[in-house]
């Protein structure tokens, strides 16, 4: 981030997202933003961390301690925090009204039950793992806002299972990576029922 010479000034808001609040690269990026006059906020899991103290304001994840390297709870709660922030900013800017805000917040409140339903389908998850475990390379694809989710999915597989995986933008598949795909590489597509679903 710092070496990309970001264009920042006092009209820019920078949101630093960090689980520990102590990662050197994140803190250095925050200092870069501050030096250039940007408004600096953090989404942080570790209460009292340097990122929390350094920022002009903060949103806490409240995910609890991360035991594993994959940082799944912090990633998930940071996404929810960003979504809620976007909802409230949308209402303040007039792009959504109070009723739309309430509905979006209700939708977020349903997430724990929906995630629980997926986790409760242990037999299906076990079956899927049984089908996929022999493979040594995976490709995750996503379009638009789902591309970062594809990257994160590939990262989780690498960190937890020690299996090679890469995330890639679905629209760029035909520009090279498709040449690497064969029957020995499962492809996981993040394809939500949104405007990009038909692609």
What residue spans do the PLM features occupy?
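Glycine-rich oxoanion-binding loops at beta->alpha junctions
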Residues: 1-17, 23, 164-180
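Short coil/turn segments at beta-strand junctions that form active-site/ligand-binding loops
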Residues: 10-12, 38, 135-136, 185
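Phosphate/diphosphate-binding loops
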Residues: 12-93, 193-199
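Active-site phosphate/pyrophosphate-binding segments
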Residues: 57-188, 196
């Amino acid at each position: 981030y710092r070496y990309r010479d970001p264009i920042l000034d006092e009209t820019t808001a920078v949101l630093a997202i960090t689980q520990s609040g102590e990662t050197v690269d994140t803190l250095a990026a925050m200092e870069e933003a501050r030096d250039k006059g940007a408004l600096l906020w953090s989404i942080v899991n570790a209460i009292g961390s340097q990122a929390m103290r350094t920022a002009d304001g903060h949103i806490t994840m409240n995910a609890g301690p991360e035991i594993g390297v994959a940082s799944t709870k912090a990633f998930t709660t940071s996404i929810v925090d960003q979504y809620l922030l976007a909802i409230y900013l949308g209402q303040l800017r007039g792009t959504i009204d109070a009723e739309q805000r309430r509905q979006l917040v209700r939708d977020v409140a349903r997430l724990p039950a929906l995630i629980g339903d997926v986790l409760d389908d242990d037999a299906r998850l076990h079956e899927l793992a049984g089908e996929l475990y022999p493979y040594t390379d995976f490709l995750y694809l996503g379009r638009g806002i789902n591309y970062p989710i594809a990257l994160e999915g590939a990262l989780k597989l690498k960190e937890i299972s020690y299996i090679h995986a890469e995330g890639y933008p679905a629209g760029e598949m035909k520009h090279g990576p498709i040449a690497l795909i064969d029957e020995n590489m499962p492809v996981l597509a993040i394809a939500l029922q949104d405007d990009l679903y038909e692609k």
